[in-house]
């Protein structure tokens, strides 16, 4: 239902009006999902990787300092360290975190964490 908003974000990224910033752990998460949670053929996985490269994500390395902050955030807000990593990265880079996770937005209640429908 929110695919149009997601397409706008991707289009803005392609047009260099917005940048999509992600922690490098997204690469492991996607690779793991494609390898263990789907029945994608090797060809499909290869195409997914090509598509991912074309999106031109700004991939930020995860540091021990970021993980320390994510752990503290995770405990305070009762969210996963994985999700907290995105919050800490967005906060540190002074950018918005856009998510389709209603529960997460309501749980953290931070002004820079926006629901995809607000984009």
Where are these regions (language model features)?
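Acidic catalytic patch
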Residues: 1, 24-26, 46-75
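Short, well-structured N-terminal submotif of metal-dependent ribonuclease cores
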Residues: 1-22, 37-46, 119
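Short beta-strand scaffold positions
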Residues: 21-22, 61, 81-84, 99
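Alpha-helix capping/helix-boundary segments
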Residues: 26, 66, 86, 103-104
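Acidic, PIN/NYN-like endoribonuclease modules and their adjacent C-terminal/linker elements
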Residues: 60, 87-119
